[in-house]
Amino acid sequence: MKRINKTAEDQFLINFKAQNPNGTWDEFRNHEQGILYKRLKQHICNDQMYLCAYCEIDLDRENEHEIKVEHFKSKSGSLPGGSNWHLEWSNLLAVCLGGTNTGDDFELPANLSCDSYKSHYEDKNKINDKDWTGKILLPLTLPDAHNFFTFEKVTGKLLPNESYCNTISIDGKPAAETLSIVTKTIEVLNLNCSRLNNARRKLLFHFNNCARERNLRKLHNLLLQWNQGEPKFFQTTRDIIIRDDRICQGLLNGTIRY
């Protein structure tokens, strides 16, 4: 999960909220035949460089039906008289389908993730307070560069980076709570489902194949592809692989040359 820097809210959303202060998300989606909804979704995706806000898989630029708009504070928990989570710009994230499109390849709901699993988690655990701020990581408030995660290279599972978590406060919470917030993030979004674990292992396999060739120039070129420009799918996993490898660090900081 990487930081998301949202740009300014679209004026058409501001106008809709002014005219419909209690408007629902469905009402906005259907407003003007859905044209404004599609524009808003594209804006959100552009801010995220077409990566899922939670698991970081690529979002399909050519098929907007493969992309959902997620409400970090689940809109079903928005109460009358309070802030309208349905239309709150800072509450809107672009996410993948969370495994709902994998057919029979993976057992469900065990292999749901992201907002698809969050919704399942809320129902299963009868969650009433659906404001997840300060309970799980919010991509909008993450540090620009962070090391909240590591991962098991055998299983592909994400793990909290405990020593780092204990030094960083997040969302106004003391650093002593960060480890539990990161742990809860993995749980609520099901970031360790087999489907995502397998994808991380595949990325590591690709790296290991390149590293085994002992061609430092080729490895350096791979690292530059991973480490420069816009974030790529599973960028957090790429960053962890680079961070944990001495040769990678040496190639990037210039202490190892070829």
Swiss-Prot record:
Taxonomically, the superkingdom here is Bacteria
Q: What is this protein called?
A: Retron Ec83 putative HNH endonuclease
User: Which GO MF terms does the UniProt record name?
Assistant: endonuclease activity
Q: Where is the signal peptide?
A: none
Asked if the record carries the keyword Hydrolase, the reply is yes
- UniProt keyword annotations, A-Z: Antiviral defense, Endonuclease, Hydrolase, Nuclease
Q: What does this protein do?
A: Putative HNH endonuclease component of antiviral defense system retron Ec83, composed of a non-coding RNA (ncRNA), a reverse transcriptase (RT), a probable ATPase and this protein. Expression of retron Ec78 confers protection against bacteriophage T2, T4 and T6. At multiplicity of infection (MOI) of 0.02 cultures slow growth when infected with T4 but do not collapse, at MOI 2 cultures enter growth stasis.
Q: Which biological process terms from the Gene Ontology are attached to this UniProt entry?
A: defense response to virus
Is rRNA-binding among the key words of this record?
no
InterPro entries named in the record = HNH78-like
